[in-house]
Amino acid sequence: VKLSLINEDICHREGEFAEITRKVADDLVKIVHGKKNDYVATLFAGSGSICIDVAIGSLVPKDKKVMIVNNGFYNDRALQAAQYYGIGVVDCKFDVLELPDLAIVEETLKKNADDVAVVYMAHQETGTGLCNPIREVGAIAHKYGKIFVSDTTSTLGIVPINVYDDNLDFCMASSQKGINAFTGCSFLIGKKEYIEKTKDFAKRSYYTNLWRQYSYFKEHGEMNFTPPVQIIYSMQQALKEHFEEGEKAKYERFMAISELIRAEVAALGLEELLPREKTTGLVIAIKYPEDENFDFKKVHDYLYENGI
């Protein structure tokens, strides 16, 4: 993947490069088992947070609200994005170390059903490793006729995701995460039918408007604004390797590494922050030792200097 960054110079408006970008977008939909007629991947130049901005700013109609199932930093980031755009929020708040109570989620949505258009929840809270129940929350959203959006930035490409089985209308990620490319390109995968409806929604942003980017790509086969050329080359290679290894084998490889780390953490007498059944296994959060001799910076520097 790193070698794929070294490529011949090319104008980002060349048809040859547009074809590469189209193939990357199609492959991203395949990763989450979406059908091309139903789902589309829309690419943006930027970090993963740009997709939070895109989703919140583009998918909520004027005078409607977003309900955020909020138990961590990344859900809170979506809440802040909504506040910046003046979008009404129903903040369904839970403790950062606890999974959302589905009964409370449904009760809250039912109470606010007339006002809410979109239900939003992160799949994995990266700070804790907590894995949220997207399938169940998505089912609740659909029961009340709402669009369900999940920030799958830190899981997509490693944890198996199926947009149909997991009740996902929209999900998102960025190039450097689960697909294992390099930083600089993020993407929102969503239902074409709903994106088409957003044409008449409030236009809250110029650069991060989903309809603008989607419709330009649909017509011209390329991104509206300058794409991160080298990063898309790295995505092309990373996706090739993803499909060659296979979803199941890749997931099992990551879980084997996770088990090894957990075993060594336990051997050091350290304690994991969360019960394993609450996590994906991709993030292993450790309780900060109470020993006064523990120095995080020294531990960090030692690991860094030894390439760990």
Predicted regions and their residues:
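Conserved N-terminal alpha-helix of the aminotransferase class I/II PLP-enzyme fold
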Residues: 4-54, 58, 73, 81
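Active-site phosphate-binding strand-loop segment of PLP-dependent enzymes
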Residues: 100-157, 170
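Active-site C-terminal subdomain of aminotransferase-like
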Residues: 176-263
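Conserved PLP-anchoring active-site segment centered on the Schiff-base-forming lysine
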Residues: 60-76
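Conserved active-site segment immediately N-terminal to the catalytic lysine
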Residues: 164-176
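Conserved C-terminal alpha-helix-loop-beta "cap" of PLP-dependent enzymes
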Residues: 77, 266-308
